[in-house]
């Protein structure tokens, strides 16, 4: 049963859409966007051609229409009922650029894959970016969640962030404005990040290459990189590793429907067949419940979950726990 109506929403935008150069798709299947390959429809998806096109669209959008922004879908779970309102998915052509900007500085578009900035830095003898080689996803998501791996994180490298607000106004945020913490930014949720300026340090290419090779080898050895996964499912609680807590409750390899906690790395949830978003979220909340009952620790999702549940299929937090 469809919970959204994209054609009706498109009609509300009026004739101004004829001036747009990007792509408008009513009832867009989100399972084609997310790495989990599961989930419902976006009521209306817009892929802007460039920044000006994005601004034009935002000025057409009625204030009461919900707005969601997605990147490459690497750490995203869209519920089976879909996402009401507009989903903006930035295009690689308009928002995927990479360029040097001053000594040891790189500007990256929001949809630029994380590993591309690592490669460009290496090619130009700029150190400090090798950790990005082990992070799936794009720069926009890294800026939003302070993505990190292998001892590095986004907050260490970012200088400023370009963003557009709901009304189409451009903003430039400093690192302090971003309010970074562990896998978190306190920047306003309504801002659409369009690029970031990063700074590294001079380093020999051979040393950078060795570091990137180590990152790649580690990731391929301990993570299910060839599976349909969204990356790390839960954040590491202070003083603990999420995977160890999951392992202690027997969560490694646990399956619900077509969803499984990976046997290779049990903080990675994978779609092993035709899992629904319900299967995946139910599994995650079951794990949270088991960990809480044993240790009293409430694992926090690192995977972003969006959209509506199907009627009668709502997933409750901490499944199986009678009281918190």
Swiss-Prot record:
Cofactor requirement: FAD
Gene coding for it: murB
Single biological process term from Gene Ontology: regulation of cell shape
Function, as annotated: Cell wall formation.
Identification of the protein by name: UDP-N-acetylenolpyruvoylglucosamine reductase
Subcellular location, record wording: Cytoplasm
UniProt domain FAD-binding PCMH-type: residue ranges: 38-217
Family per record: Belongs to the MurB family.
Keywords: Cell cycle, Cell division, Cell shape, Cell wall biogenesis/degradation, Cytoplasm, FAD, Flavoprotein, NADP, Oxidoreductase, Peptidoglycan synthesis
Organism expressing this protein natively: Allorhizobium ampelinum (strain ATCC BAA-846 / DSM 112012 / S4)
Record has Cell cycle as a keyword: yes
GO cellular component: cytosol
Active site: 183, 232, 302
Listed pathway(s): Cell wall biogenesis; peptidoglycan biosynthesis
Entry GO MF terms: FAD binding; UDP-N-acetylmuramate dehydrogenase activity
């Amino acid at each position: 049963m469809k919970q959204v109506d994209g054609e009706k929403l498109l009609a509300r935008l009026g004739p101004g859409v004829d001036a747009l150069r990007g792509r408008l798709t009513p009832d867009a299947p989100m399972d084609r966007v997310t790495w989990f390959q599961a989930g419902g429809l976006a009521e209306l998806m817009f892929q802007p051609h460039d920044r000006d096109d994005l601004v034009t669209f935002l000025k057409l959008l009625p204030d009461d229409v919900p707005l969601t922004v997605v990147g490459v879908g690497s750490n995203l779970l869209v519920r089976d009922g879909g996402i009401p309102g507009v989903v903006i998915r930035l295009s690689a052509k308009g928002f995927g650029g990479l360029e040097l900007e001053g000594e040891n500085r790189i500007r990256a578009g929001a949809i630029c894959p994380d590993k591309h900035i690592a490669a460009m830095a290496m090619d130009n003898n700029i150190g400090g970016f090798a950790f990005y080689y082990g992070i799936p996803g794009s720069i926009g998501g890294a800026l939003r969640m302070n993505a990190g791996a292998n001892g590095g994180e986004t907050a260490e490298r970012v200088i400023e962030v370009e963003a557009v607000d709901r009304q189409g106004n451009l903003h430039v945020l400093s690192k302090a404005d971003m309010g970074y913490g562990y896998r978190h930014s306190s920047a306003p949720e309504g801002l659409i990040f369009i690029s970031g300026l990063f700074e590294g340090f001079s380093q020999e290419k051979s040393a950078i290459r060795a570091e990137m090779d180590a990152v790649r080898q580690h990731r391929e050895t301990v993570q299910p990189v060839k599976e349909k996964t969204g990356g790390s499912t839960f954040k590491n609680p202070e003083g603990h590793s999420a995977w160890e807590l999951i392992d202690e409750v027997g969560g490694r390899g646990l399956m619900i429907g077509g969803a499984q906690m990976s046997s290779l790395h049990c903080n990675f949830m994978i779609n092993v067949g035709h899992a629904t978003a319900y299967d995946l979220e139910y599994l995650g909340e079951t794990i949270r419940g088991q960990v809480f009952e044993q240790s009293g620790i409430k694992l926090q999702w690192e995977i972003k979950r969006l959209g509506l549940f199907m009627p009668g299929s709502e997933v409750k937090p901490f499944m199986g726990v009678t009281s918190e």
